[in-house]
Amino acid sequence: MTFSVQETLFSLLRLNGISGHESSIANVMQHAFEQQAKDVWRDRLGNVVARYGSDKSDALRLMIFAHMDEVGFMVRKIEPSGFLRFERVGGPAQITMPGSIVTLAGCSGDIMGCIGIKAYHFAKGDERTQPPALDKLWIDIGAKDKADAERMGIQVGTPVTLYNPPHCLGNDLVCSKALDDRLGCTALLGVAEALASTPLDIAVFLVASVQEEFNIRGIVPVLRRVRPDLAIGIDITPSCDTPDLQDYSDVRVNHGVGITCLNYHGRGTLAGLITPPRLLRMLETTAHENNIPVQREVAPGVITETGYIQVELDGIPCASLSIPCRYTHSPAEVASLRDLADCIRLLTALANMSPEQFPIDPETGATQEARP
């Protein structure tokens, strides 16, 4: 079977799943994993885990993960007029909300809607140039009143996702909602396909995780069951090749996988990852040996599950691979199929390494300690 990066990515992008509502994506991931993996399970929180490679109890355990959920909204109140008030789930870009088309997961099926905006003809002053506060926004589904909205299947708690089906742009770029992080999910499936018939010296656990966009900790139950020796996350990172960001960093689309040196959220002390130098060397050496382009990144304002994984159990060495993405958390994110394919190649090369090539121990550079 030939793995198609574009077809797989587009099929995942057409699915909807805000944090806590990832089941449609999880079903696809689980079914795909079950075709070749030695063991597959879904935990009570919704994480999907697949095991490949060595069955030995003392085998080095590499965990590779990406999150299934996307940013979106949830209905907070149905107005008597039938318009819907809502809250953000995760961090969708508020500046892009007015005028956006959305999909609501109604009780009887999906319902289309749009986020209303004051008629430009009647807008005055800042109303014409500044995005309204969240409590000034509403969703219009065409309901004539509250009872009509309820008959259409809407209730408090109805999940809402941005609507923008995937499109191809020039130079192997794609535009869609939810590239964060269906790119990573696609990478997991690409690695799964590559490992299906390959004997490995290590145990590889591929994890499609939940609730990253909401609390960044949905993957924690998996760690405590798998107990990995090393974890590598796959996520997007802001591409800085647009006119507004080109002076900020050199990370750009179509120039390879990003290797995170540093990321953090908030003011730097809340959570983040400083990748151990020995892991940076391992990633860059492996990429060089396999002619895979990579680019280093320092990304303040970005955080992934690695910020919390690293302090679990006895400490878990972590690294992050990033796929550069323009217009993050908007309805129209843009990323490169080439970069995604390179990410799959690098992860596959890592999975095929021998245990001795993984620098687990910080003092000696040794591999994992013998398991009790």
Swiss-Prot record:
Q: Which UniProt keywords apply?
A: Aminopeptidase, Hydrolase, Metal-binding, Metalloprotease, Protease
| E.C. code | 3.4.11.-
| Positions bound to a divalent metal cation 1 | 67, 180, 235
Q: Where does a divalent metal cation 2 bind?
A: 180, 213, 329
Query: InterPro entries from the xrefs?
Result: Peptidase_M42, Peptidase_M42_aminopept, Peptidase_M42_dom2
Q: Sorted alphabetically, which CDD domains does this protein's record hold?
A: M42_Frv
EC class, as a word, reads hydrolase
A Pfam entry, by short name: Peptidase_M42
| SUPFAM superfamilies per the UniProt record, alphabetical | Aminopeptidase/glucanase lid domain, Zn-dependent exopeptidases
Residues of the active site are 212 (proton acceptor)
Which Gene Ontology BP annotations are present? proteolysis
The cofactor(s) it depends on are: a divalent metal cation
Q: Which family does it belong to?
A: Belongs to the peptidase M42 family.
Q: Which PANTHER family match?
A: AMINOPEPTIDASE, AMINOPEPTIDASE SGCX-RELATED
Listed name of the protein: Putative aminopeptidase SgcX
- Organism, scientific name: Salmonella typhi
Q: Which gene encodes it?
A: sgcX
